[in-house]
């Protein structure tokens, strides 16, 4: 990755910081600083430069977050080795189980695999690679890596299979020492099986040891086992070896991987890349900003003078306004003193009038006391009348009580008849129960016999199936016999108690019924007929009174209904009128509000209002208005037209060019702001036919969205806008412009423009409100409305609405008052009608009853009090017997329950546990036992039940006879003569009525006397009111003076709050003074700091006002003050028109920007220093860690390549080593020097040489960070026989490879012959099969036969040697030729010859031995001094030595092939 370019940075010593002694430190955020710059129209080169740096970083693939804390970034620790188990344990693949996977139809077992080296061989197309695909499938690789488009294609297509699955059995093993290399210890507790299944719907499922799992769980398990799923170093497929050789030194884009990234990914230093990239970008930004902020300080110091003039004018306006406020305050204080003097005179006159008022008040109070006496007398008479009325009501109540008792006696007879009916029903029910009891024993015996027969059958089945439980059942019967006997006795006792309780309850019911009958009989008297006659007279009197009240209620109800109906009829009309009046009021209110607040509601040009005033005055009749106010547009397009045509919308429209000149003259005369006039006549000869064009445009035309009634104004809009099209975004505009290039102009909804040439304009802050929108079509904001007329109409309308509301309220009160009364009267009327009807019916019934009683009157015996007491005592004794019987029954039930629970527990313990196998038969037997017991109880208890039923029936018949006799007796009884009581009551009622009439006459006289006293009192009240009126007039004067005083005090409060401060010159702005204690919080909230220059220019008018004492001024002084006020008001108005209200704000903003640039320059300088230190720290850490790993990998790759190629060399170095400050810029260079050749980059080698060098690099990575599993697919395809043998022997015999499991697919004999296991793959009829071969086991099995073959071979070899002895001598002579040792060979201590199966080099021929390691001039290993690399010798010396090497190599013949073959054979042992 290329580093970012550094910007020039001003040094810390010569930064142009401004003098900041009088101002605090200012630190604006980015948005607020940008806002200040835009408002002041200052170009922000800091932000623009930073934006370019952001684009540059994005192009380089840096994901940058400005808020990220890069100084405290956490770098993850170094990677740990995948197989660093301290106990030497590792996970290996034991077996692979495949089912319907690819070419494997059905179930197959691949294995067992060897713990180190397993070779897979077979013909092309037989399915060797499917073994690796099965591994990748379980490991969770995607379909593309498994050579298919989708996972469901992995299912075998030869049969109708719905799914396929692969299971890998992993086994934890511990390697034995070297002498027992082939042996290992299996740790059975750590074995695991991973299964993955896929179906036709592409649904995949993982299982770990037959438990559902996720892919994440599988990958975590593999990672714990040491299989690196992140870098996939364990997997080397066809062609991937050469891919290493084709890698560039470093990647040029994120989609490819270079040698540097490949190594960093393995080493782990890639964790430094992202933080270093972010820090480099951050340093570039900080360098740019620190430099640019220093330059901004110098620029803003020059801007101060530009904004100072407007600030001075604003402060002059502030001082003039405060002087005016000061003089107004003095005038108000003068008025307050004058009002106080006038109020003293008024209060003295008030004292005189107060005495007269008190005198008249005493006279009025005496008259009022007389009225109160009359009222007291009136109330006393009224209370007497009320008391007499209450007495009459009491006598009436007694009369009603007498009638109620008579009705109760009638009810007694009715109750007696009902009781008789109930008793007869109970008697019939008892007869039916008796019949059932009589027939129950025979039915019970039949049922018992049938159930006993069934029980015997079930018992026989139970005995057959439950012989093992018989003894326990016998034990249970023996142990529970005593308790069962007690239980039966208690049940019998309980039955007796319940029978006794039932009898007592029956006697109690009979006694209570007799007591009730006796009470009813005792209440019967001998005066029944007299009582009925009295009731008849009372009922007739009530009937007359109710009829009279009914007539009065009917009359009042009709009158109130008439009033209520009229009110209800008027109210709807009144309410509709009210709605109209309120709507009109709302419209007037809105017009007043709109006229008053037009400037706040919408945008208005400062000259528009004045021009409208001139038009209304008749001075400027041709003025039409501001162009933006003469049309409207939907609010969606407001931003687009207001931003693009904001200047044109402020044009002021007139009719002719002469009126334009008149308007310009008015602007000069009244010093109005600069504006543009446009006249409509210039469009008469202009072709505007296109505004109504029917042509179809590729997007909406902005002109079509404008709503305008006046056709001339509409033409003016078209002349300015033409056919510009409006779209949502610039992307859409660009897309349409490509389709119709150069044909239209486009504008976006936020105000950006795409011209016909393709140039973009706009992009600034969007503007709104320059034209009316359709949501507020009546909002003009330009025409000055006569507020006085509007407010007068508003007040008049309010009075009309108030009068209407009073009328409506009166009608609603009539409705509200009469509505409830009408409902009450209607209810009362219905009650009286029902009462009169009932009274008529009752009168007829009473007359008939009186006649019947007079005919049937007979004598009967009365029930005495002694009889009642005797019956009550008998009932109490029966209740006591019932309670005692219930208590005894409850106690017996508790004992029965205890015995029952005891037997149940015994049964559960002894029997129930042994009967689970015959539960159904046992349940049925238990049910039958209960039914038999129930039938037995019916048979045994039948006599007692029958006796009870007969007794109950007899009792009920007896009670029926008694109740019938009683009812007959009551029916024949008649009330005797007893009218004396009712006569007395009637007499008392008449006496009470006469007394009430007399007292009412006296009460009427008292009312007349009270009214005369009221008239006299009213005369005194009138006199008092006349005096009070004079008193109130004085009070009104005083109140008026107090109100004026209050108003002036309020004006003083306004003056106190009206003092102008610099903060009020621009109300929308928020300011804070430099001495404010909360300045930091307010600055954070967006406040602008007021400069010291502004505050120092404030004149002390407020202090002078506060020191001025309140007093009356002399006339000439007061007049002079008034003149000064008039002059100052004109000056204030002049300043208001001339000064820019944003002047102080702009000056404060430029000062704040200046202080912010000073603060930012210091802040970014400090940040830059800290980030540079952090960047250098991370670069050094990355370089040190990577250099250490690179040195190891380079040395190991070189050593392996030298050993395997017998004279070759390899090197891994930085491309930019010694040329750049950042060696990572150029990447890693993999250079190789094959035997007898020159140095070349690996991509320039032949295919076999690339493969050999890449494999050395792969094995070097295994040395650096080993992994327990390697899967290789035909890595030897490009190698010759010799190199294949060397690679195979290295994999098998190296100590470094013994701690890993290799699964290799190969078609080369030299490779698979060294395998510890051979997995043969073959195909029959399109289906793949396999066979696993153990070469060692086969060799042991065939050893006797091989011994015979070897002896025969030796005999024949001896004969052959005798024939070709000359050739052998020649071969031995050639074997003594020694190849010159390679000079400057590096001594390698990390690998040993034992890795290749050799104890030392004495077993090798002399030409294959290691040269003495005495010369290391070209070594890249570190020296002992200061850990610095040894410098290379001069280029000329190296070239001379290379020439010597070439001469020696040319003079040295190659060894014969037989020597190499011998070395290979020796290395196998």
Swiss-Prot record:
Binding-site positions, ATP: 122-129
Keywords, alphabetical: ATP-binding, Chromosome, Coiled coil, DNA condensation, Nucleotide-binding, Nucleus
Localization: Nucleus; Chromosome
GO MF entry, a single one: ATP hydrolysis activity
Nucleus in keyword set: yes
Recorded phenotype for the gene knockout or disruption: RNAi-mediated knockdown causes derepression of X chromosome linked genes in embryos and in larval stages L1 and L3. Leads to an increase of 'Lys-16' acetylation of histone H4 (H4K16ac) on hermaphrodite X chromosomes. In the TOR complex 2 mutant background rict-1, suppresses the growth delay and elevated body fat index. In a sex-1 mutant background, leads to high XX-specific embryonic lethality.
GO-annotated cellular components: condensin complex; dosage compensation complex; nuclear chromosome; nucleus; X chromosome
Main location group: nucleus
Compositional bias of kind Basic and acidic residues: 9-18
InterPro entries referenced in this protein's UniProt entry, alphabetically: P-loop_NTPase, RecF/RecN/SMC_N, SMC, SMC_hinge, SMC_hinge_sf
Ranges for domain SMC hinge: 621-736
Pfam families: SMC_hinge (PF06470), SMC_N (PF02463)
Gene Ontology BP annotations: dosage compensation by hypoactivation of X chromosome; mitotic chromosome condensation; negative regulation of gene expression
SUPFAM superfamilies named among the record's database cross-references: P-loop containing nucleoside triphosphate hydrolases, Smc hinge domain
Origin superkingdom: Eukaryota
Comp. bias regions, Acidic residues: 1439-1449
Coiled coil: 356-542, 805-974, 1016-1056, 1159-1182
Free-text note on domains in this protein's UniProt record: Consists of two putative central coiled-coil regions flanked by putative globular regions at the N- and C-termini.
Subunit structure: Component of the dosage compensation complex, which contains the mix-1/SMC2 and dpy-27/SMC4 heterodimer, and three non SMC subunits that probably regulate the complex: dpy-26, capg-1 and dpy-28. Within the complex, interacts with dpy-28, mix-1, dpy-26 and capg-1. Interacts with dpy-21. Interacts with dpy-28; the interaction is required for dpy-28 protein stability and dpy-28 association with the X chromosome. Interacts with smcl-1.
Family that this chain belongs to: Belongs to the SMC family. SMC4 subfamily.
Function: Central component of the condensin I-like dosage compensation complex that associates specifically with hermaphrodite X chromosomes to reduce their gene transcription throughout development. Its strong similarity with the condensin subunit smc4 suggests that it may reduce the X-chromosome transcript level by condensing the chromatin structure during interphase. Involved in the recruitment of the dosage compensation proteins mix-1 and dpy-21 to the X chromosome. Might be involved in the reduction of histone H4 lysine 16 acetylation (H4K16ac) on dosage compensated X chromosomes.
Name this polypeptide is given: Chromosome condensation protein dpy-27
